[in-house]
Amino acid sequence: MEESTMNSIAVFCGSSIGASDAYREGAIQLGKELAKRQITLIYGGASVGIMATVADTVLQEGGKVIGVIPTLLEQREIAHQQLTELIVVNTMHERKSKMMELADGFIALPGGPGTLEEFFEVFTWNQIGLIQKPCAIFNIEQYFDLLISFFDHMQQEQFLKAQYREALIVDGNAAALLDQCQSFVPPAIKTYELSK
């Protein structure tokens, strides 16, 4: 099968740096790998937290970074001013929509509810066929272990089909994670069965 075209990846991650230095180190690893592979980073456009670490690393390594930020956050003076391109949109919904349009794949790094909300939306869009792009979890320091167990529980309880659980890419190594994103083959689109 053909490997997916991977010119850009959207990263969803925290506007905080987290409790462990490992999160920052993982973000640096990912940034270096993206730049090395000439994959453009699409992200939330802020100059704070793990998201800034990924962006700064890609830029330092000679890569391209496109930030997408809503006016509300730009006005709070947290927009990153050194990016290849900064796109300012009106709402959070427009931000997600633009990131989904620009990206050939999606990676979640450690973050909070906003990170999960963004990731779950693209994961769901894959299930219903609105997009067919890799969705990956960069499991730095086993941060997402409980969430991954919950995905397994969803599958066991038949609220998540096996093909979608299997399509979810999870790895704690940046290079291995991107290898899997680049060789991603989309699962069949979800069909619905009526209850008996």
What are these regions (language model features)?
Residues 2-102, 119, 140-175, 179, ...:
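A cross-family phosphate/adenosyl-ligand binding-site feature
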Residues 41-43, 104-114:
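A short, small-residue-rich loop immediately preceding and capping a beta-strand
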Residues 59, 126-133, 159-160:
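Arginine/glycine-rich "motif VI" loop of SF2 helicases in the C-terminal RecA-like domain
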Residues 110, 129-139:
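Short, proline-centered helix/strand-breaking motifs
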